[in-house]
Amino acid sequence: MNMRAERVGEQMKQEIMDIANNKVKDPRIGFLTITDVQLTNDLSIATVYLTVLGNEKQKADTFKGLEKAKGFIKSELGSRMRLRIIPELNFEYDESIDYGNKIERMIQDLHKKD
């Protein structure tokens, strides 16, 4: 990823977080944290990685709500960011947090056995 895509991704991360938490009124969208935004070099596609606080049903509901609000989020991004074309948004669950928690639990279990 080039420098411009990185800078735009960081700004998009902040803006999407604000839009999802403050502007989108869908009750299905729970407490979410956007961990990263990866853009293609031509800025046409943005993969938004996020984590959701809650169980599997709440995660699924949040993703359904985000898919439904995708057009609204893109229009808000268009008014907030100075880009010629607003990238297509793809939302994906960031499993690195869960993986890190699993490793942390395993390390704690090893220390308890000693």
Curated annotation (Swiss-Prot):
InterPro entries: KH_dom-like_a/b, RbfA, RbfA_dom_sf, Ribosome-bd_factorA_CS. It is found in: Cytoplasm. One of its GO terms (molecular function) is ribosomal small subunit binding. Keywords: Cytoplasm, Ribosome biogenesis. Its main location: cytoplasm. Monomer. Binds 30S ribosomal subunits, but not 50S ribosomal subunits or 70S ribosomes. One of several proteins that assist in the late maturation steps of the functional core of the 30S ribosomal subunit. Associates with free 30S ribosomal subunits (but not with 30S subunits that are part of 70S ribosomes or polysomes). Required for efficient processing of 16S rRNA. May interact with the 5'-terminal helix region of 16S rRNA. This is Ribosome-binding factor A. It comes from Staphylococcus saprophyticus subsp. saprophyticus (strain ATCC 15305 / DSM 20229 / NCIMB 8711 / NCTC 7292 / S-41).
